[in-house]
């Protein structure tokens, strides 16, 4: 009886995996690509969300991270200016585990475009931001290495953004 139950579990696992792979493949189909993308984006304002209190304990500083990201994006072809409707925003959510003397950071880099729209529920024009592109990555390390580990993650996210931007603008450049 245990043998049948084990095989049944394996069969369910294989079916679940096939369904997952099918959904993942479908989600990557160019026909399902979102309408919002980076096509035509050239000018950006690079912004940063506030660091958590634990970030200081973990050695993170916006004074180090800000120029790292901004320079990476500019080297990749973006033009950074102080005023534009397109934002590239980096958020770093950091926690410190005192018991293990370790830090964890969840980094999110996104590109957002300010748009105006008519809100029928209130009857007037509003403004807000739409997501053009967004990715995230996590890193865990000891306190002594966390700033360097986080810098690597920020650079990887910037590289991914630059690659996506170039792909979206292949035909327009």
Predicted regions and their residues:
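C-terminal/domain-edge helix-coil "capping" segments
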Residues: 28-36, 121-173
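Bacterial N-terminal signal peptides
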Residues: 11-22
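N-terminal, post-signal-peptide region of Sec/Tat-exported proteins
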Residues: 58-88
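Bacterial N-terminal signal peptides that target proteins for export
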Residues: 2-13
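Surface-exposed short loop/turn segments
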Residues: 76, 84-144
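A structural "domain/chain start" motif
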Residues: 23-67, 163-173
């Amino acid at each position: 009886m245990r043998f049948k139950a084990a095989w049944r579990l394996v069969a369910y696992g294989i079916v679940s995996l096939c369904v997952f792979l099918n959904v993942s493949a479908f989600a990557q189909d160019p026909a399902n690509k979102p309408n919002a993308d980076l096509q035509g984006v050239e000018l950006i304002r690079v912004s940063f969300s506030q660091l958590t209190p634990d970030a200081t304990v973990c050695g993170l500083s916006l004074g180090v991270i800000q120029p790292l990201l901004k320079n990476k994006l500019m080297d990749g072809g973006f033009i950074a200016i102080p005023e534009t409707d397109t934002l590239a925003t980096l958020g770093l959510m950091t926690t410190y585990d005192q018991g293990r003397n370790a830090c964890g950071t969840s980094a999110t880099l996104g590109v957002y475009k300010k748009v105006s729209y008519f809100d029928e529920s209130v009857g007037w024009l509003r403004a807000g931001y739409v997501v053009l592109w967004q990715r995230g990555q996590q890193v865990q390390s000891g306190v002594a290495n966390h700033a360097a580990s986080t810098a690597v993650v920020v650079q990887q996210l910037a590289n991914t953004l630059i690659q996506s931007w170039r792909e979206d603008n292949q035909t327009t450049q």
